[in-house]
């Protein structure tokens, strides 16, 4: 663990929102457990990602933390209590956005949010402001049954924010969204973090996780096989090489690679910089996808 990671871990002590220790769960009649001995913590104001292929145990873990599944082994506490120990006040403090939309199809988007707002005892957000934030203002008074899947996904996300939750559970938050609307959702998530909210997301989209998450855990067959910040995971498995694209003597684009160790004293590297027009310089960094495949031996399918 780096000095920075130790500092982050130290700062997390006393501000833990989620603590999971030895968590196991088996569905009735299932041959194998869906979750096997998971251990992790999530600190206040952190975006934590549980990453893995379909069937890895991500959504099951999330459902256990939300309180939708019971009878697990080990410990899974939120604000120092198991979800089953909380009363209705637990759901006043959390927001949930499921991957599969579940709305009242014969109500409008606005009416759906108004209805769900009425279920909370505390103050709630303005439905129109939430709809505008996710790009649905023009469709606020359209029946949800006429919404596309992507529109329903955005409505689900907006609904999860209606009670201004302290802790947000997101399941594949950008799945099926076009780049413009996916960016809207990502920007809202980043803003929530800046306001001190805690976000627990599950996804198999490594690019989204890399962009948003402070830390990620790779999950395969119900087990966590790696856990760290995306940057640390990538650095640990990156090739220490620099790739330079430059214009050759004839004007064509040429490429050269140099080792990072001793780069400051590499005469060939300095010759390229001095004598050619450099277009790009990049370290040969592994992607989070690359790291996942290397660590787990699995593809994200």
UniProtKB/Swiss-Prot annotation:
The keyword Membrane belongs to this UniProt entry's keyword annotation: yes
Gene Ontology CC entries for this record: plasma membrane
Keyword Ribosomal protein found: no
Membrane topology reported for the UniProt record: Peripheral membrane protein
Matches recorded under InterPro entries: AAA+_ATPase, ABC_transporter-like_ATP-bd, ABC_transporter-like_CS, ABC_transporter_ATP-binding, P-loop_NTPase
SUPFAM superfamilies xref list: P-loop containing nucleoside triphosphate hydrolases (SSF52540)
Pfam families associated with the record: ABC_tran
GO biological process, one term: response to antibiotic
Subcellular location: Cell membrane
Residues noted as binding ATP in the record, renumbered to the chain: 52-59
Complex formation: The complex is composed of 2 ATP-binding proteins and 2 transmembrane proteins.
Family according to the record: Belongs to the ABC transporter superfamily.
Record function comment: Part of the ABC transporter complex involved in fluoroquinolones export. Probably responsible for energy coupling to the transport system.
Full protein name: Fluoroquinolones export ATP-binding protein MT2762
Native source organism of the sequence: Mycobacterium tuberculosis (strain CDC 1551 / Oshkosh)
């Amino acid at each position: 663990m780096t000095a920075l990671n130790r500092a982050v871990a130290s700062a997390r002590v006393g501000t833990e929102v989620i603590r999971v220790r030895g968590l196991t769960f088996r569905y009735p009649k299932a041959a194998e457990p869906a979750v096997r001995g998971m251990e992790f913590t999530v600190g206040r104001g952190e975006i934590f990602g549980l990453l893995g292929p379909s069937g890895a145990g991500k959504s099951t873990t999330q459902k256990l933390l939300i309180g939708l599944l019971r009878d697990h082994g080990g410990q899974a506490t939120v604000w120092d209590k198991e979800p089953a120990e909380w009363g209705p006040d637990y759901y006043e403090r959390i927001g949930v956005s499921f991957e599969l939309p579940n709305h009242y199809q014969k109500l409008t988007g606005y009416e759906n949010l108004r209805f769900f707002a009425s279920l909370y005892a505390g103050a709630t957000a303005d439905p129109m402001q939430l709809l505008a934030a996710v790009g649905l203002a023009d469709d606020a008074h359209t029946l949800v049954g006429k919404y596309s899947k992507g529109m329903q996904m955005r409505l689900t996300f907006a609904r999860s924010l209606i009670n201004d939750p302290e802790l947000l559970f997101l399941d594949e938050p950008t799945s099926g969204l076009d780049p413009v609307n996916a960016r809207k959702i990502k920007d809202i998530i980043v803003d929530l973090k800046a306001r001190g909210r805690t976000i627990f997301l599950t996804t198999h989209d490594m690019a989204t996780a890399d962009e948003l998450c402070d830390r990620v855990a790779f999950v395969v067959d119900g087990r966590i096989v790696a856990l760290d910040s995306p940057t640390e995971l990538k650095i640990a498995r990156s090739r220490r090489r620099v790739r330079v694209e430059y214009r050759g003597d004839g004007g064509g684009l040429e490429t050269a690679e140099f080792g990072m160790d001793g780069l400051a004293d590499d005469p060939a590297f300095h010759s390229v910089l001095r004598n050619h027009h450099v277009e790009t310089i990049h370290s040969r960094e592994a992607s989070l996808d690359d790291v996942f495949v290397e660590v787990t031996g699995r593809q994200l399918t």
